[in-house]
Amino acid sequence: MTTQTDDARLNSSEVRSSIEVAAPPERAFEVFTAGIDRWWTRSHHVQTGELKEIGVDPFVGGRMWEENDAGDVCTWGRVLAWEPPSRFAFSWLIGPDWGVPGPDSAGSRVTVTFTPVATGTRVDLVHDRLDAHGEGWESVRAGVGSDGGWPAGLRQFAAAV
């Protein structure tokens, strides 16, 4: 298992991170999407209280959502591409305040590709259009691009595969 983040990209409005997992693309895609609740960092949520569950609706236009321990459900993104087992993309509506997104929230985009390699699957994640979050967007880039952001998420994903 390897992970890397392209540090040069941290100076732009996108973040890139990748990892290789010892599983075929079909399995990697399924764990990344349907199995998101098994690997998502539990402290990474936008609502008050504890994260109870996080999920993905498996179709274009579907929700990226979370439920807290009080039963409140929040949609924080929308599925933009659903192409098993090779590509998955969603909008990221969580802005610089890291709070519950409003109905008119501007969003960035996360695209995840799953490419077969000799040892399994290479998973490449690109979180781009970060500047669409407006003033303070650099804090979103700093958060998702830090070692505790997408790189940590991908390591946890790899452990769940």
Map each language-model feature to its residues.
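Hydrophobic pocket/interface hotspot
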Residues: 28-32, 64, 79, 90, ...
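Short beta-edge strand/loop motif at the mouth of beta-sheet-based domains
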Residues: 35-76
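Hydrophobic-ligand binding "helix-grip"
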Residues: 54-55, 65, 69-120
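Hydrophobic ligand-binding cavity/cleft-lining segments
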Residues: 1-51
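Tryptophan-centric aromatic hotspots in well-structured domains and transmembrane helices
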Residues: 39-40, 82, 92, 130, ...
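Solvent-exposed alpha-helix faces
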Residues: 33-37, 84, 155
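Short, solvent-exposed aromatic-acidic interface loops
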Residues: 93-97, 126-133
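A conserved amphipathic terminal alpha-helix motif
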Residues: 129-161
